[in-house]
Amino acid sequence: MLFRSGGWGLYSTAQDYFRFAQMLANNGEFNGTRILSPRSVELMRAVHVPDTLPGRTPGAGWGLAVRVVTDNALRDTYLSKGSFGWSGASGTHFWVDPDAHIVAVLMAQVPATSLRPDFETAVMQAFVK
């Protein structure tokens, strides 16, 4: 029996990925259509695995299918506490910052290296004064 990674083989356009992120930002609703219940989004965004466990990223906990910023100073990010999102292996990245009312999507096919934090910084510096 062959088991593949849960994210392997998933494809999307940048526009649809943005719509997905916007739906999460709107507590499960997109263009007047309910996709997920507000409770489902709340559970996704809640920290279920804290950063205090060994091997975890300081300042970032894990919700259900998203990483959640728990301390932006420890994470060295401009994103607000409570921001959430996910990154793919080949350079895709999205996040929602509810406090700043920002949804951002990065679609790249390059190793992640510093591209993701540089993208976060550029977007937040452009929109948050």
Language-model segment annotations:
Residues 1-129:
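Catalytic loop of the DD-peptidase/beta-lactamase superfamily, centered on the K-T-G motif
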